[in-house]
Amino acid sequence: MDDTKKRIHKYIEKHDLIRSDDKLLVAVSGGPDSFALLHFLWSANLVPKEAIAVAHLNHHLRENAEKEQLAVQTFCEERDIPFFIEEVDVKKRAEKLQKGIEETARIVRYDFFEKVMAENNINKLVLAHHADDQIETILMRLVRGSSSIGWSGIQPKREVRGGYAIRPFLPITKAEIIEYATKHALPYEIDESNTSQEYTRNRYRTQLLPFLSKENPAVYEHFKRFSEETSEDFQFLEELASNLLKKNLIQNGKQSTLLLSDFKNEANPLQRRAIHLLLMYLYNDDGRVITVNHIYQIIQMIQSENPSSSIDLPKKLTVIRSYNELHFQFGERHAPPEFYHQLELNDRIELDNKASIRLKLKSSVVQTNGLNGMLLDAEDITLPLIVRNRVNGDRMTMKGQAGSKKLKDIFIDAKIPRQERDNLPVITDYTGKILWVPGVKKSAYDREFSRSKKQYIIRYTRNIGGNESMHNDIQKVLISEDELQEKIRELGRELTAEYEGRNPLVVGVLKGATPFMTDLLKRIDTYLEMDFMDVSSYGNGTVSSGEVKIIKDLNASVEGRDVLIIEDIIDSGRTLSYLVDLIKYRKAKSVKLVTLLDKPAGRNVAIEADYVGFVVPNEFVVGYGLDYAERYRNLPYIGILKPEIYSE
């Protein structure tokens, strides 16, 4: 075996590119690189010959395209190699897609390859990129200003639909490939466009590469090592960045929101890598769209003292900084819709944000529900009321303050995101006096209840969630889905060891523990029985009522049984304390408690779990079974609910 073949075999083994049970689809254009690749694979016995197939796409871009197609077809027919040929007029397709010819050619090429792989149960696409391509790619990316991940160049293996694209020729040069193809008399065609100085890559190939090779003949090996070491570094950093995104990224349809409270405290290299990873996801792994400048612009937004800013990126991606959130969304920016409603006594109006506003005459002692209800003295205002957008120059008279304050400054003080301010309802009386911005601020016209005065009450009701995503109501992802499952696997192992051979009765506490219990039981590898109780002291609020009620009792007897209680969270502890005492009273042999979450700061009674998943801070947490007003149970993670949601 000559040195060239040895290096190829060593490279394949090092990067685990080809296994004996793989099925290979070799992309053959008709040039020396791909013909040499096909011949090498055909003769190397890495896989059975019947596991090799060929794909050729005729782009109809070159004069010798028909000769190339015929050469590929003839070569395959002579050796009984299955081949797939497709013809596409790339110029017409590019006009239709409104993309460049090179980008369009790449799209149709990979669509064709992946289609053939899927239809023929092929798991590896083999491409003929070589060491010259590697150097050209790295240099082009550095000069163009690509993000640092691009510095590692062409990777030996990457995922495609249905399998992997592999590049076993990366360790050898173009000259070695030509020598191989000539030695074996392969019928390749030379692409006449390869000498045109019109293309950037050709200028690098004909001008820079000869210079570098002359300066140091070992340049190919040096760039290969640079690529591999850089790739290893970035893979390590990417794993850290991926975990960082899992904790701080909320995805909602067309919008992705990065929570900045913790993210902005991470080291700059990790922030940059996470932003690059997110952009790669948003751009469907098309790294050519992303430059270093894009990433640095976003990092500057994150680190800026300005809480509200935005930038526009390629392909209509807008990045919006809104205090401690960074929103990524595709599409044109639209001006917010203007609205103007008159609100008569006993009327109710529905707003586009799925909220409603009602005006009634006060009839009894009224509590105005925080920021979402308001009492007005009839003598202070003129009906009908007006509900509208804000306008330039809006000012509100404030309680306990002389003069008035700009609405813009009120929004800034309340940290209302800039993109949301134009959508907030502003309530005035008929003369134009601003009375209230629901959920934000009340004016000096807000009154206490009076039996002697005629008063009106305005109610602002928000339909929590509405058509919007529930993810938008989350202030911070506290525990990611992956972290939950990792902890559940750990608890499952501990409980398997604890209860092996004891056939415990596992009691799930409805409703919150259901997702946790479902996943946990899959990880307990021993015989058990399960039952459920619904014992509550909450209701629809955020604070325990203190009264414990049995809504659903057990069907099974606990007498003489080892009982394991599964709960979603221990907060005040009243419910669980009552339940443990009850089961002990019913003569259970043993009672142990496993809880996903423990909130020690909320404890009112002395109770501790035997097994704890996570200790959480004294915040209102929802998701993965935990709710507020019966919502958010189906979130796949544990998140902290925004205070404005449960203070409404």
Curated annotation (Swiss-Prot):
ATP binds at S29, G30, G31, P32, D33, S34. Mg(2+) binds at D627. Binds 2 magnesium ions per subunit. One of the ions does not make direct protein contacts. This is Bifunctional protein TilS/HprT. The N-terminal region contains the highly conserved SGGXDS motif, predicted to be a P-loop motif involved in ATP binding. The keyword Membrane does not apply. Ligates lysine onto the cytidine present at position 34 of the AUA codon-specific tRNA(Ile) that contains the anticodon CAU, in an ATP-dependent manner. Cytidine is converted to lysidine, thus changing the amino acid specificity of the tRNA from methionine to isoleucine. Its EC number is 6.3.4.19, 2.4.2.8. InterPro entries: Hxn_phspho_trans (IPR005904), Lysidine-tRNA-synth_C (IPR012796), PRibTrfase_dom (IPR000836), PRTase-like (IPR029057), Rossmann-like_a/b/a_fold (IPR014729), TilS/TtcA_N (IPR011063), tRNA_Ile_lys_synt (IPR012094), tRNA_Ile_lys_synt_N (IPR012795). It catalyses: IMP + diphosphate = hypoxanthine + 5-phospho-alpha-D-ribose 1-diphosphate; GMP + diphosphate = guanine + 5-phospho-alpha-D-ribose 1-diphosphate; cytidine(34) in tRNA(Ile2) + L-lysine + ATP = lysidine(34) in tRNA(Ile2) + AMP + diphosphate + H(+). It comes from Listeria innocua serovar 6a (strain ATCC BAA-680 / CLIP 11262).
